[in-house]
């Protein structure tokens, strides 16, 4: 794997990364079961913080190529892609519950993943199997390395044949601490 990035003090950072490798069990007990099959990923990421408003924008988009056996049906995608953009806006910075540098943020995540890029060989129609999401949220950071977050996730999931999407929504609560 490898990553390269360019950073500008005002504009932010743009990076490109790649990773990959063999993912299947191609031998067992000295017997060759299959050839080595690879999965390879290329991703572009971006992050910046507005010096005027403190707004943070972070995003990533990835392309994936999977070596799927030709005998598998088209429901096993050989190409995938997806990404997200997170926008985080601090709305309150002050002492809260004894934490001197607490921050309350409004957040929004927009995301898309297509698990099977392409068209059906027989009909030429687009293969579905993709998810779109909009996730507004509220996060509290009592200290820089800890976050308590409440989101409402709005999701549209398309099946393989791109029938009308399953529409789901729900609250998510999370706590994370990085050290």
Q: Which sequence ranges carry the predicted segments?
A:
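Outer membrane beta-barrel transmembrane domains
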Residues: 25-27, 74, 88-141, 149
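Membrane-embedded beta-strand positions in outer-membrane beta-barrel channels/transporters
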Residues: 1-3, 43-45, 84-86, 135, ...
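Surface-exposed beta-loop-beta
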Residues: 1-77
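Outer-membrane beta-barrel "beta-signal"
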Residues: 87, 166-179
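Transmembrane beta-strands of outer-membrane beta-barrel pores
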Residues: 8, 18-24, 50, 61-67, ...
């Amino acid at each position: 794997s490898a990553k390269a990035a360019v950073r500008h003090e005002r504009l932010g950072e743009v990076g490109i990364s790649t990773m990959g490798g063999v993912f299947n069990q191609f031998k067992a007990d000295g017997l060759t079961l299959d050839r080595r099959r690879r999965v390879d990923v290329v991703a572009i990421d971006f992050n910046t913080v507005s010096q005027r408003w403190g707004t943070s924008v972070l995003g990533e988009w990835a392309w994936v190529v999977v070596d799927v056996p030709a005998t598998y049906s088209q429901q096993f995608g050989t190409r995938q892609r997806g990404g997200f953009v997170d926008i985080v806006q601090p709305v309150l910075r002050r002492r809260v519950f004894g934490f001197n540098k607490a921050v309350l943020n409004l957040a929004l995540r927009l995301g898309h993943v297509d698990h099977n890029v392409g068209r059906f060989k027989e009909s030429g129609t687009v293969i579905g199997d993709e998810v779109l999401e909009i996730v507004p949220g509220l996060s509290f950071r009592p200290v820089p390395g800890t976050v308590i977050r409440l989101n409402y996730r709005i999701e549209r999931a398309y099946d393989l044949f791109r029938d009308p999407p399953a529409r789901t929504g729900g609250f998510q609560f999370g706590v994370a601490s990085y050290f």
